[in-house]
Swiss-Prot record:
The keyword Cell membrane applies. This is ATP synthase subunit alpha. The record marks 362 as: Required for activity. Belongs to the ATPase alpha/beta chains family. The gene is atpA. Produces ATP from ADP in the presence of a proton gradient across the membrane. The alpha chain is a regulatory subunit. It comes from Streptococcus pneumoniae (strain CGSP14). Its main location: membrane. GO terms for molecular function: ADP binding; ATP binding; proton-transporting ATP synthase activity, rotational mechanism. It is found in: Cell membrane. Pfam families: ATP-synt_ab (PF00006), ATP-synt_ab_C (PF00306), ATP-synt_ab_N (PF02874). It catalyses: ATP + H2O + 4 H(+)(in) = ADP + phosphate + 5 H(+)(out). InterPro entries: ATP_synth_asu-like_sf, ATP_synth_asu_C, ATP_synth_asu_C_sf, ATP_synth_F1_a_nt-bd_dom, ATP_synth_F1_asu, ATPase_F1/V1/A1_a/bsu_N, ATPase_F1/V1/A1_a/bsu_N_sf, ATPase_F1/V1/A1_a/bsu_nucl-bd.
Amino acid sequence: MAINAQEISALIKQQIENFKPNFDVTETGVVTYIGDGIARAHGLENVMSGELLNFENGSYGMAQNLESTDVGIIILGDFTDIREGDTIRRTGKIMEVPVGESLIGRVVDPLGRPVDGLGEIHTDKTRPVEAPAPGVMQRKSVSEPLQTGLKAIDALVPIGRGQRELIIGDRQTGKTTIAIDTILNQKDQDMICIYVAIGQKESTVRTQVETLRQYGALDYTIVVTASASQPSPLLFLAPYTGVAMAEEFMYQGKHVLIVYDDLSKQAVAYRELSLLLRRPPGREAFPGDVFYLHSRLLERSAKVSDELGGGSITALPFIETQAGDISAYIATNVISITDGQIFLGDGLFNAGIRPAIDAGSSVSRVGGSAQIKAMKKVAGTLRIDLASYRELEAFTKFGSDLDAATQAKLNRGRRTVEVLKQPVHKPLPVEKQVTILYALTHGFLDTVPVDDIVRFEEEFHAFFDAQHPEILETIRDTKDLPEEAVLDAAITEFLNQSSFQ
């Protein structure tokens, strides 16, 4: 058999042409330090800031510090199996979380993994946790109200869709209750709610989830939880995960309410990470970019232009103060980023005034333009009246004689305080808020004993539901008050047949 050299060379040539190398090139490094949710690695020459990295044990990390000799990495998950000398690989991707409709009604961790025991979440959509906020020309001014169902907020410090309203106060002053009540009030309001629990006790989160489920609010709510027992990288990441999920809905033209409970714990977690990464500490040992930590998060809440779908993200960030000190570092940072704040005083809370909103220190910078006409008319002077009542009340403690005008102001003030009280998890529709506040500001409650105000209000709402539903309907549909004579006649009719006259 003759060997044909030409055939053999053609065959070899064909084999070479058809050869496909079965390998992929991945840049790897070596772990040089591990501990407290932080790793350092050598050899990742081209890694990007914020890039996702893969450890040998399957855990992921995120590149934070890019230094001349090594890379500082925060570990997202369990770091107990990682050892010095382990190999670490680049993924070439930045941190992304699952988003979309299938997350609604679920409880997830900051990586988007379910923690409620209800099985896998099936979604093929993801969004990066860090994303640029909408630009100046991509935004619209706040014009639609977000009804919290709480008289004290909707009347005194109204919130609009797309606003950032800080809720600030000491621990145990009812901050979370305000947020949960606001979420409950979004039922049938075409809103999606996201509750981000940062550094909370797991038992507390369980209680909140059960409350939401009991009132049917879990049907339109996503809960993101990073409990106190989890490593600080997850606490740092949780708010960004929540807002990434919210952005998916906002850019579809939907309206979202997101609650960050609370950002003080996120700042503490970030301080811990920064100190472990050897970043230079600043005031109160926080790193220099702690303002940017919160500003880049809260700037992603907006009312976007019609070209982008006209959706919105309304943010309710929480800050916990120490002994009512709202001039602390993190508190003043967040106050300067947000569009107003609701200050909860422990003195008011302990005196039984709940929600314990301090009208003097609370403000809504843009919510006034979103308030409905009816509420503007009845609550126009309520803030000033309440503030002057508190001032007068302080003076009366000295026991001086009072003229009739001052006495009338004090009487109206006491009734105002009683009307603005509200039981837990009982948000009130805006049309009912308007009717009771109208009765208050037009002097119909001046003869009702202060101790009977709560009972008066219950019977008052029941009367309007039964006898005058058309008045409530008019307020709900037109967003304005009906003729004053109609309202006055209805309230007088109630007073005549009640025991309060």
